[in-house]
Amino acid sequence: MTQLFRKIINDPVYGFITIRHPFIFQLINHPAFQRLRRISQLGLSHLVYPGAIHNRFQHALGAMHLMQNAIDELRVRGVEITKAEEEGLLAAILLHDIGHGPYSHALEHSIVGGVHHEDISAGLMDQMNRDLNGGLQLAIDIFNNQYHKPLS
């Protein structure tokens, strides 16, 4: 009997989010991803709107949850998505903003001119891919729009 992997995270927007893949849970626990807990999704908005305290960690988990919903719906509609593709899609969306720095877009070009957060995201994903023995390659290909699903 195959034992299912399931971790549940209580999200302030979507409620309970289920993590179905050990590799995705490993990504969430990676120090590069955990740093997103300290990076504001809404920049300096909290100075005007005290309730604007959403962080990049919460945003990434919510985006991953919505991607999981989209994958499930596509499968219901007959679209074949392999387990590897599912993990790659979830990892790519989970890490899409990993390159953001303090206060997100508000300081993006002030700290290092001419460098976009997408470039930093790609560099961090490459480093994480090395840390994870190539386990992120499909996600990186998806992130860089280099993955093309083979036709059946």
Feature annotation, model-predicted:
Residues 1-39, 47-90, 99, 103-152:
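Sequence-structural signature of the catalytic-core scaffold of metal-dependent phosphohydrolases
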